[in-house]
Amino acid sequence: MHQRRFELIRKPELEGSSFLFNDVEVRYVATCPETGISFYCSNGHGGAIGVRVYPNGRKALAGICGAKYGKPYAHGKSEYLNFKNAFGHNKGIFIHHAVYTAWVGPFDKPYIDHKNGITTDNRWENLEPVTGTENSRRAGILRGLRATGINPAELPFDVLDKYLAPEAQKDPKTVMDHDLKNHCEN
């Protein structure tokens, strides 16, 4: 199991608060480290969906309702909640954006990356704001690890953080081989 780098605390100040993202309102209902985070998303035109993200990062959808154009939907294992507004245009939000904003706060970069490469793992410690270039670079790095037989999801976050750091990529063989070998031997 992954190590927790920070102590999670309940955030009662978030409960009842909301923010707008891509014309979708996200309202937090409960934030508790033992039970996860619960929130609902609404498009302002009658479409709403309840979401719970458990401490292990998995999600459950509940309470989907909607008007003619407002009904939200999620694509199977997709982490994207999609809404149609009154004009029939798609609007949506990624679940990991709502989770990161709840536990850490607003992010200043355009993307949120899943450090271990598993897009359904929405634990806040697995999420990190990145630029588009960083996001693409990290995806290539994780593909390379998998090709060598190393599962990034099994690496502790401290090893993964070092491996994904931009300075490690200048010469990844010499920088990271020691840590990866130690982890794989244990």
What are these regions (language model features)?
Residues M1-Y111, I118-V175, D179, H183:
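Conserved recognition-core residues within compact binding domains
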